[in-house]
Amino acid sequence: GVKYDVGMESRHDTKEDIAPEEKNNIVQDITYVAILKDYGKDVTIPCPEGYNKDEFACACASHVCIMPKEPDRVWSKDMMITYGKLPNNKYMINWPIEGNDYYVNLIEMTREEREEALKYAKHYTMCFVYFLQHELGFNTLGLADDEYPTADKLPFIPYHRESRRIHGLVRFDLNHACEPFRQSQPLYRTCIAVGNYPVDHHHTRYHGYEELPNLYFHPIPSYGLPLGTLISKDVEGLI
């Protein structure tokens, strides 16, 4: 089959100065995004089993925020809730700062194992919804009943930030993005897609995230993705 990498590669393999010393299989946090709607009345849900407000205490500046994980990223309550404001009095809840990000590596699980693991990710989002309602006073906001045709009113799938990275004909790394004209391989000449976003990893729900490289909005210029990254070097005719 197609060979691939998962997690973070070693700096010895990629020559990236922000990569870890040793490779690991730690993927980015996923998020079970929720769409809330303002019902104009108290719609606070029952307290979810195992709820712990401390896990969300510094999602924003509030009376319960004492020791934030990321002191320079504590937004106001209003900025936090309006970050994903939508039309029709709805709000997207996809909040990485002590919010509903959730760590699980689903990549090599069976279908049954994934379904079971995602129950916990959904539950974590519902705990955050309860935190918003009960601790922060957003008690008129509840899961929108007209957004997703699902029994639990949550999306069909979570927000995945990372997947397998195949072993392609070429490897595109941070150095090619940052300094495309100084590399031994002029991969920029074969680009088929462009990107324009910093290196933004979500890891704070991983237990032990403090030991990982700080990859929060590491700046890079706009870049081109070369065709060779999408063509497997092991399997003929896949693409």
How would you describe each model-predicted region?
Residues 2-239:
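Flavin (FAD/FMN)-binding glycine-rich loop and adjacent Rossmann-like elements that form
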